[in-house]
């Protein structure tokens, strides 16, 4: 599969794995010596590019929300846009937001 980053350069060929669960992800990680996790690929450099990629986009579930504290537990592939859509109407906002809402929680942490 051809992949690139925010700037659309470089474009590389990569083997992209897309697990839908933590168990699937563990199997992929155990079977590959060199891989990189990737969300939306919105980084400015090449840090989301590698010959072997594990995409977190299917791991996109919000698992828990504490309405008293605003604490969210979610999988790495949850997009900021989904968090904002779900929690701004409830009176909550993320304490830090980037210039785009098209990133994943995992990418923001990375």
Report each predicted region and the residues it spans.
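Glycine-rich N-terminal segment of FAD-binding domains in flavoprotein oxidoreductases
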Residues: 7-102
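Short glycine- and basic-residue-enriched patches
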Residues: 110
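N-terminal regions that are enriched for targeting/export leaders
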Residues: 1-4
